């Protein structure tokens, strides 16, 4: 019989990609669930997925037995299939330097000092820990956009988790908005990636812009331009 492993769900995302993103880890510790999350203004999907796994592993002492559950095949295959070859070639792939090498090397060092079993799980398939990590990563992205400290873990006891329940019904008013064909298509694609309707996606974007106000929107746009 192997060691008793602490189960961890790690998830990250970015919208648009590249753009503002968030990461999260849900640690099912014996003493209770620990939740970590954060975000960055200018990043990518893969960097947020890697960051989620890194922040989760940083929570544990060396030698800890962990089962890391991720819905990112990029993360799982990087560690379990590709990394050994990259290291043998001096952190290079067959076509050039390893992408996100800073995070890959950090992840490699952390995993080497711990007993980690890597498990891929299908995203948005109803697995509670994965769904929770996904919602927290979304919250991390929103907080990064609102100017809160990004990239720092914020542990939460299970009974003090941030409220992420669906919004209560409110009175609505229909407003017609004319969009260019390109913008309408981009909106539809982004909503599809987020798993929501274009109307809900647009409403969320409008609310966020109203919260940020013009100076905040300008700051986010400048960060994205620097990252591009």
Swiss-Prot record:
InterPro entries: RNase_H (IPR050092), RNaseH-like_sf (IPR012337), RNaseH_domain (IPR002156), RNaseH_sf (IPR036397), RNaseHI (IPR022892). Residues 2-142 form the RNase H type-1 domain. Its EC number is 3.1.26.4. Signal peptide: none annotated. GO terms for biological process: DNA replication, removal of RNA primer. Mg(2+) 1 binds at residues 11, 49, 71. It catalyses: Endonucleolytic cleavage to 5'-phosphomonoester. Binds 1 Mg(2+) ion per subunit. May bind a second metal ion at a regulatory site, or after substrate binding. Keywords: Cytoplasm, Endonuclease, Hydrolase, Magnesium, Metal-binding, Nuclease. It is an enzyme of class 3 (hydrolase). It is found in: Cytoplasm. One of its GO terms (cellular component) is cytoplasm. Its cofactor is Mg(2+). GO terms for molecular function: magnesium ion binding; nucleic acid binding; RNA-DNA hybrid ribonuclease activity. Its main location: cytoplasm. NCBIfam families: PRK00203.1. Monomer. Belongs to the RNase H family. This is Ribonuclease H.
